[in-house]
Amino acid sequence: MTKAGSKGGNLRDKLDGNELDLSLSDLNEVPVKELAALPKATVLDLSCNKLTTLPSDFCGLTHLVKLDLSKNKLRQLPADFGRLVNLQHLDLLNNRLVTLPVSFAQLKSLKWLDLKDNPLDPVLAKVAGDCLDEKQCKQCANKVLQHMKAVQADQERERQRRLEIDREAEKKWEAKQRAKEAQERELRKREKAEEKERRRKEYDALKAAKREQEKKPKKETNQAPKSKSSSRPRKPPPRKHTRSWAVLKLLLLLLLCVAGGLVACRVTELQQQPLCTSVNTIYDNAVRGLRSHDILQWVLQTDSQQ
C-alpha cells in the first residue's frame, strides 16, 4: 500500500480549476496538509482508494463544496464531520458505514447524498432510501438531514435529562451534606452548652463551698465567748429606772414619817399640842370620809371619766 504523499504526487499538478482528482490513487491516508494548502480545490474526488478512516483534521477543510468518497473502506466518519458546513454534494457509495455522526445534522448546505451499498442501520437505511437517481439522492440528503436533526435533538434531550439527573443527584448530595453539617453543628452546640452548664455548676459549687468555709470561723468565734461566759458567774442585770426607784423610796420615807407623826400625835403626850390637834382633826375627817365612801366614789367616777 502507498502512503498519501507518494502516489498523491504534486497535488497542484492534479488541480484543474477548482477540481482536484485523487481517485484511483491507491491512497490509504488522506493528505490533509497538502489539501489545506489548496483552498481553491472546492471539489475533491477521493473515490476508489483504500481509505478506512478520515483524520479529525480532515474536517478543517471547510472550503469543500463537493466530496466523493465512494468505493473506499470507510467504517465511520469523524465525530465533527459537521464542520464541513459548505458541503453540498457528498458521495459515500459502497463503503462500510453503519451509522453517521450526530454532527451530520449541521451540514445545512447539503443538497445531494448517496449512501447506497453500505451496511446501514435499518432505521437509517429506510430514511436514506435507494438513491437510484438524481431526484432520490436529493431526497436522501433532505431526509437524512432531518433524521439526524431528530437524532441530535433526542441526544440533546437525553443529555439534558442526564444533566438534570446529575444536578438533582448533586442537589440531594449537597442537601445531605448540609443536613449532616447542620447536625454536626447542632451536636457541637449542644456539647458546648452542656460543657458550659457543667462548668457553671462547678463554679457555683465552688462558690458555695467557699461561702461555707467563710461562715465556719464566724460560728466558732460566736460560740467561743458563749462557752467562756457560761463558766463565769452571771452578773446581775443592770438596774433600770434608777430614778423611779429613788422617787418611790422617797415617797415611802415620807409615808413612814407621816405615819410616825400620826402615831405620835395620837398616842403620846404630844396630842395636846396645836400641831397634833390639827393632825388628829385631819385624820378623823379622813376616816369619816372613807367610811361614807365619798372618796372611793370620787376615785371611781374619776376613773370612769378617764
Swiss-Prot record:
InterPro entries to which the protein is assigned, alphabetical: Leu-rich_rpt, Leu-rich_rpt_typical-subtyp, LRR_dom_sf, LRR_domain-containing
Tell me which residues bear Phosphoserine.
23, 25
Q: What is the protein's given name?
A: Leucine-rich repeat-containing protein 59
Q: Which residues cross the membrane?
A: 245-265
Gene name per UniProt: LRRC59
Q: Where is the composition biased (Basic and acidic residues)?
A: 175-221
Lineage of this protein's species? Eukaryota, Metazoa, Chordata, Craniata, Vertebrata
Give start-end positions of Basic residues composition bias: 229-241
Pinpoint the residue ranges of every LRR repeat in the record: 10-31, 40-62, 63-84, 86-107, 109-128
**Where is it predominantly found?**
membrane
Could you give the subunit structure recorded for this chain?
Can form homodimers. Interacts with SGO1. Interacts with FGF1.
Q: Which organism is it from?
A: Bos taurus
Q: Does the keyword Cell division apply?
A: no
